[in-house]
Each structure stands twice: as C-alpha cells, then as structure tokens.
Amino acid sequence: MTGHPLDAIPPELPVYPLHDQVIFPHMSFPLFIGKEHMGLVEEALRNNRLLVVLTVLAIDPITGREQFARVGTICRINQVLRFPEGGCKIILEGVNRVRLITTLQVTPFAMASVSLIPERENRNSVAQALMQSIIALLRVAQSLGQMLPEDAHHAIDRIDESGKLADSLAVYLNMEVKDQQRLLETLDPLERLKDVYLFLTTEIQKMQARGGGSADRSRQAVRSQKEHLLREQLKHIQNQLGEEDPHQADIRQFRSIVQSDEMPEVVRSVAEKELARLERINPSSPEYTVARSYVEYLCNMPWQRGTSDILDIDRAQQTLDDDHYDLVEVKERILEFLAVHSLKSSLKGPILCFVGPPGVGKTSLGRSIARSLGRKFIRISLGGMKDEAEIRGHRRTYIGAMPGRIIQEICRAGANNPVFMLDEVDKIGQDFRGDPAAALLEVLDPEQNYSFTDHYLDVPFDLSHVMFITTANVMDTVPPPLRDRMEVLRLPGYSDEEKLQIAFKYLIPKQVSENGLDKHPLQFEEQAVLKIIKNYTREAGVRSIDRQIASVCRKVAKAVAQGKDAPEVIRSDQVEKMLGPRKYFSDVAAEEDRVGVVTGLAWTESGGDIIFVEVSTMAGRKDLTLTGSLGNVMQESAKTALSYVRAHHADFGIDAQVFENLDIHLHVPSGAIPKDGPSAGVTIATALISQLTRRPARRNVAMTGELTLTGRILPIGGVKEKVLAARRAGVTTVLLPERNRENLKELDDHILAEMTVLLVDNLSEVVAHTLIPDTEHGPRLFDCPQHLAVDPPSGS
C-alpha cells in the first residue's frame, strides 16, 4: 500500500523503538503494543496519527538508554485494535524516510525532532534494466524454491518505480537487520537496486548449491541477467556520450509511423499496444525479435499507400501492342477497365484468369498490363503449393511464424494496388496442411477481400484495390467455387502466320540483343523462320521457337567471338546446318487410308494435338480391351461408342452376329501418355465402324466431338487449338460439332480458306465424310470365319 505524501510534519513526534526489524516506506506493518507504550500511541493519535519508527541499534550498558539509527520511517497509524486487558494492535503504513535531528525526551516515551528526506526516482535505462533483471532472478529463485510468498510475486510485478521495488524486496527477502537498515539509509534508488540484485544473486547461488540437478540451468540464467545488466549500462554510457541506442531508435521510428495518418484506426490501436509491449521486452530476449518483426510488418504495410494509375487509354493500347501480338480480347478487357476507372475512381480491381497452353504469353502479359497501368507487378507461382498457410500465413504463436505470400509480396512492393499474378492456379495441391485453393476464395472475391485477415497480421487488410490475374493451362482441375470468382479469358494457340509475325516483331530482336549481336547486323529470311516453325517446333505457343532462334544466335555469336566469318542473313538452307536434322514433319497424319485407324483431335495443357484411334478385331467372346493409358471418361466414351454401333448396326451394314464372336481391341498411341476426356467419342465410334465394315478412313480427315447413346454429337472446347493442330499435321478436313459453329469466329479467314471445316450433328454424317465408300477400293471384308462375313454396304 502506498502512503499519502506529507507536505509538513509536526516539530515533535513520538518515536517507537523497533528491535530486530526495519520498516520501509510504502509498506504496511502490524505492531503489538504493550501497556507501557500506550501513551506513545495516544500521543501519535493526537498528532495526525503520525509517529516515527526507528530501529534500535544498541543499548547503552551503563545508562540503559537505546541508541537509535539516524534514518528511520515516519508512519501513519491506519488501524487500532484495543485489547480488553490493555495494550493494542496497530497497523502502520510507512510514508516517508526521515532523518533524526535530536531526541527531545526519553520518558515516559521518546519524542524527537525529524526532517523529511525527499524521495528520489531514477527512471533511466540502467534502472529499468536492473528492475527487469531482478524480476527475472526472482523467477529463477522461484524455480529453485519458494523465496517469496505467492501474493508477493503478484504485488512486485505491478511495481514500476525502482525505489519502491528495492524497498519492497527488502521487506520480503530474508535479509539481516543491518542490511535492511543500510538499504533504508541508501537514498539513491539505483544503488538500492544494485544491493538487492547482489543479494538475490548470492541467495540463488546458495540455493543452487542445495538444489543439485537444476543448478546449471539456473546458473546460466543468472549469467544471462548479468550480461543483460552490463549491456544496459553500456547503453546508458552511450546515451551520455550522445550515441543513440538502436533499440530506442527503432521504437521512436515505429512510433512516428504508428502516429501518422496512414494506418487505419483499428490497426493503429493494435500497433500501439504491441509497441508498448515491445518497449518492456529485453532486446536480448527471443521474444523481442518476434514482437519487433510483427510491429515492423504493421508499420511497413501499405495500408493506404498506392501508385497512381496511368489512365491514358491510347498509351496503354500502345504499350500492350508493343509487348504482345494479337490477344485482342484480353487487351480490350484491360482497356475497358481503364475506361471505367477514368470515370469512377473508386473501382475494385478485376479478377482475371488467363487460360491457354504454355508459351502463349500469359505471364508476360501480366507484366505488360502492370506497365501499361503504371502499377507495381507481383508474381507468385502456386504450382505444387499444398500448405494453406502459404496464403493465409502462420499464427504468431508458432516459432518462425510469417505472413502468407499475399501479404509478404504486397509489403515488399510497398503499394496496395499492384497487379498481382497468381501463376499456375490449376496446379495447386492439397494435403493434411489444408487446401490453398479454399484459402484463395476470400482473396479472389471482391465482396470479401476488402477485409482479408492474414493469420500473422491478425488485422484486416484491404485487397480490393489489387488487380489479381491468375493463369492456368486448363480449367478442369480448378475447383468450381474458385472458377466462379474469376473472369476467364482464353488465350488460344498461335497459327504459323502469327508465330512468324511474333518471331520477327519480338523474338528475333530480343535474342539478337541478349546474345550481344547488336553491333553485328543479323537478319532472318522469312522462309528460314517458317522452316524453324514447321520443322523444329510443334507447340501452340512460341517458347520453342524462341529457343531455336536463340540457338541460331548463339552459333553466330560464337563465330563472331572467334573472328570467323559470321552470316549476316540466316537463309532457309542454313537452318538445318545450325539446328541439325528436322525434328517434326508437317504430314504427320496417316500416310495412307487405313481400315480401323481414324484421326482425332485432342486439347491438352500444351494446346491442340492430333491422336490416332486404332481398332483391331479377332475371334473371341465379345470382350472389349482398351489400352493407351485411357482415363475413366475416355473409357466410358469407348463403351458408349460400342453400344451405339451395336444398337444401330443395320444403319452401317454390320451383321449383328459379328459382335457375338469377336473380341475388340481399341488402342490410342502413345501408350505412355495419359489421355482422358469425352471429345474422342465420335472418333472411337468411327474407328469401330471402319474396322467392322472394312471401309478405310480418309487420312486427311480429323474429327472431334462427344457422342451420346442416341448418336448426337455434343459441343467441345478448344476449337481453335484443335484446328491449328490439324493444320500443323497436314490435315485438310476437320469435322466439328454443329453446336460449335460460333467458335469458328475465333479462326482467321486465311485458315478457313486453307482448310475445309464441316459441321456435323450426328454420327451418320461423320461416317459419310470420313469412311471411303466400297466402290472406291473394291469389296473389303474383315478377317473372320467365312460364315460371319457380311456383304459390303452399297453406300453410306
């Protein structure tokens, strides 16, 4: 309990002699008063309930008079409990240190004149460090044995003044009277703290000697506290020399940021609380690093700091055109955003998803968009990510906790409105640590991401100003709720003509510059580039073309570096010398019309491609064998196709008895590549009919479409990619579902002029366009027992 300060004291006060005890200011102390001292108590009650308590140092053996200490404590009587037989119990409260001036009387009780000793308070860094060290030593002592009562620990933890802490511990600790009196007479609080610290250290060493097993651990704790004390003293000396304490410099810098107008109010309140906590933590403590990192993130986050958008639509159009060829739909969407943003400043960032095969420019397009808007660009790859904490962060209770990648990158960018690209969103994993795709639902939802709460920050951050762009090769593996939050923009593959334009406009100048050929003029003939495209690459994008052009440039650079004659123009006949034998052939479609082999079209992560469906029959018991690493959906498509052919055998001139004595083997090369999807249904059915009727399939016809049990052909995706793949493979006629008519608008006019694209609605139309009538090749019967052979149909 803290006593009330005294402005003045009476000239004479009764003195209570205390043997073998010392009373300190701010402490409550019970005393039992005998009858012989009741007059002293009555006198004190008349003098504002005040009396002086002096410790008796000795008694004169001749006179019997008590010799008082020169420094004592003026106390206030808070409570008097009188006993029936005489005497009483009083509760004294220490108020202030006093110095004995003179003793005025001795009998019947001592009266003296005293003077108040002003209480000094020392709040410098050394005193604060000593207080923290003493508290830590008390915890060490408590682990070795109960040095203080439990309630005393709680009381001491609440003391924030160095002098009071030293006085309180002097009462609770088992100190000798002479040591307590010396502390009472020590007026400098810092010196009193040092004495208490030394006493605690000595006591702990004694307890360690008795404690045994835990001695090493406790000794290390004491040593750490000593080191901490020395460091704090060093800081105090540095301050006196004008050298600033780095810890205090950080605190001041953080506080200036917290008190600025940039932080939202809810974040400021959390930051101020953490900053106050940081000030109380010992900088050498591991907890200090954790707290400082958290405060640093709070101060460095761009809560209301962003870049100014460049709202010049013509300039943005020029920037996008300079970086990327074609991609009209994507560019138009960005310009629409700019136009709306120029009319309405408080516009939420769009959530776009670029879907297309590798190498078509999805990632580089995001960087170009950021440049056209004048925004910071951030990119993280989600491929293989399996830990939800990568998105939401770790809670600070974990060792090594950090924010999620979203908050980390925004903090690093220093702007709250960057263009943020989440690459490979279709390749996110999932395991026991959570589902990152589910964590992205809040990030990519404009109705929720204005208050995105990272587990580490634990305060909301507004993501609504961020323009999120995700990329994917296919959308099949993206969860439907996540897909629903994104505006999907498809980037189809490029035709050979488009690749040629991209090579001359972007790839060749880039590789010439990167390979140090700026001073050596190097040009490519158009036929040379076309030869590279057709003979050395087979992809929907332009990544392989870029690598082949880079290989040519490196060989020229090598010749220049060696002082040899280096070509200035790359001609068509030089390509094979530099890149070796051709790797791909344009006429990869079947070289001849074959029975049971039909060309289909597939859509993969790498763009469009052609596939061959091969069917073979043999005597057996109606077994259907499927090989070629076919997925469940494709296997079901094969069974559906066979069921349709059996149900409508008469329409195709097939005897029903054929199916009772045959095994059918269906294979789709290459066997090591997994294949799946429903769009091969019409191709499988056509191959079955070709084999069972012995009618060859035209080698220059390719098809795609999902077949139903009723013979209808359902629409499919990736029309442009599949048509381009057919064109690369030398196919001249492509059969597409009638319901994909609108998708033909994606194809350039010159492609439609070069190829024949037929729209079909049922399997009969497909058979008519694909299988060669028997009149062209003569009768063909499949190899089976003669009694099973059927007459070839007259036509289809």
Swiss-Prot record:
One GO cellular component, as annotated: cytoplasm
UniProt catalytic activity: Hydrolysis of proteins in presence of ATP
Pfam families for the chain: AAA, Lon_C, Lon_lid, LON_substr_bdg
PROSITE patterns with a match to the protein in the record: LON_N, LON_PROTEOLYTIC, LON_SER
Compartments (UniProt record): Cytoplasm
Residue stretches making up the Lon N-terminal domain: 13-204
One GO MF term: serine-type endopeptidase activity
Catalytic residues in the record: S679, K722
Family membership: Belongs to the peptidase S16 family.
Subunit structure comment from the entry: Homohexamer. Organized in a ring with a central cavity.
NCBIfam families attached to this UniProt entry: lon (TIGR00763)
Name of this chain's protein: Lon protease 2
Organism: Syntrophotalea carbinolica (strain DSM 2380 / NBRC 103641 / GraBd1) (Pelobacter carbinolicus)
